[in-house]
Curated annotation (Swiss-Prot):
Keywords tagged on the record: ATP synthesis, ATP-binding, CF(1), Chloroplast, Hydrogen ion transport, Ion transport, Membrane, Nucleotide-binding, Plastid, Thylakoid, Translocase, Transport
GO cellular component: chloroplast thylakoid membrane; proton-transporting ATP synthase complex
SUPFAM superfamilies the UniProt entry points to: C-terminal domain of alpha and beta subunits of F1 ATP synthase, N-terminal domain of alpha and beta subunits of F1 ATP synthase, P-loop containing nucleoside triphosphate hydrolases
Its EC number(s): 7.1.2.2
Chain's role: Produces ATP from ADP in the presence of a proton gradient across the membrane. The alpha chain is a regulatory subunit.
Protein name: ATP synthase subunit alpha, chloroplastic
Subunit field text: F-type ATPases have 2 components, CF(1) - the catalytic core - and CF(0) - the membrane proton channel. CF(1) has five subunits: alpha(3), beta(3), gamma(1), delta(1), epsilon(1). CF(0) has four main subunits: a, b, b' and c.
Cell location: Plastid, Chloroplast thylakoid membrane
Reaction it catalyzes: ATP + H2O + 4 H(+)(in) = ADP + phosphate + 5 H(+)(out)
Membrane protein topology class: Peripheral membrane protein
Native species: Chlorella vulgaris (Green alga)
Disulfide bond residue pairs: none
Catalytic class of the enzyme: translocase
Amino acid sequence: MVKIRPDEISSIIKQQIEQYQQEVKAVNVGTVFQVGDGIARIYGLDKVMAGELVEFEDGTVGIALNLEAKNVGAVLMGEGTRVQEGSSVRATGKIAQIPVGDGYLGRVVNSLARPIDGKGEIATKENRLIESPAPGIISRRSVHEPLQTGIVAIDAMIPIGRGQRELIIGDRQTGKTAIAVDTILNQKGKDVVCVYVAIGQKASSIAQVVNTLQERGAMDYTIIVAATADSPATLQYLSPYTGAALAEYFMYTGRHTLVIYDDLTKQAQAYREMSLLLRRPPGREAYPGDVFYLHSRLLERAAKLNDKLGSGSMTALPVVETQEGDVSAYIPTNVISITDGQIFLSADIFNAGIRPAINVGISVSRVGSAAQPKAMKQVAGKLKLELAQFAELEAFSQFASDLDQATQNQLARGQRLRELLKQSQSSPLSLEDQVASIYAGTNGYLDVLPADRVRAFLVGLRQYLATNKAKYGEILRSTNALTDEAQTLLKEALKEYTEEFLASAK
């Protein structure tokens, strides 16, 4: 039997007393006195900061948004069904942040960057704040590199550059998401990381986008942030900032990124819902006074960084839905004034069978022309002019019965150019194919064809160039310009293929 020595016990107790350190930890705690509709009003929490995360007894997290004299209004980031009146809340001292890293590529995540695709956890090493300040003027460079969408009408007449913000605006069901998805598909092999943020959409629509991207091998360089229609308003409001934070990680490591916010109208509606429940005073269309700041602080994060910061870029394609083509509503006018141009999609053009249904007359790109490849500049100027003249003549010709030959020729050319701009969904075109199509249209090679055969001719021409004049494509890919040699090859191909096509049509 072991003998217990009293001196040993006393020395152990003495040692423990000497090593004891009293730590006083002050925790900022409050009490819920009202809860409902995803909003909690909290008494106490005197030292809470605006935008600080607060944690409820059941583990639900909220964001303190309203700091009033006697209480704090917090929005819940979750269902919050177990949050009750009288339960305690503590301030965490943190503001909303998410993990970021290369592990997110190919994954579908929610507004808090947690995976929802059933493929397991995502390994990350660093975190980023969901809301971080936009790069300053000194940190930026002017937009000078092209971002090709693969859509002829956009790349020729409304060009987009890396670091630009280009709005896609139009009524529902006019092909806004289709343009965004085609742009992602066209980034394959161009070392551009794409982030698609779905805000308030049906889960089935998001699944459709994921399937399209997977089938075409585009998920390898894409992250999808999904806040479905049944998500709480708080998560729909946060999702665009999460997408921007994920893209910023790549931008600040010198990579090029493309972020699509589909769509910001639903984010504004979610923010309006939160603000009205928080009893903030409503303004125009019942939106709160800071709804402009909601979008401006998001879109200003898109930038082309200077060489010192690694020359990375973030290009933003926000989508906004209009009602009956009303561009003068509150949210559309706000976002138009923030962005560097807009692509306007018209329901009338869509119903007339012209897809993509881009209204070239009122669509504009304010900075992208500086980034347009030289080859496209060489052929696009003439296309713009001829289409503008055609639109004017077409309106006039509806009232005139007999037209002279020159006018008839111009109308016929315009109809063929319009056919040239039609494009199937999920079939983006390379620069050399776009240049060949436009060159054929503006130089009269399509005038000899019936208008309904133009698209079939162009498909055949692209195949003919790839097999018989491969050097043409090589020159354009290496120089980005339509050199004399490339032009000669293109003319030869057009002459040879036109004869072949007309002979086969007989």
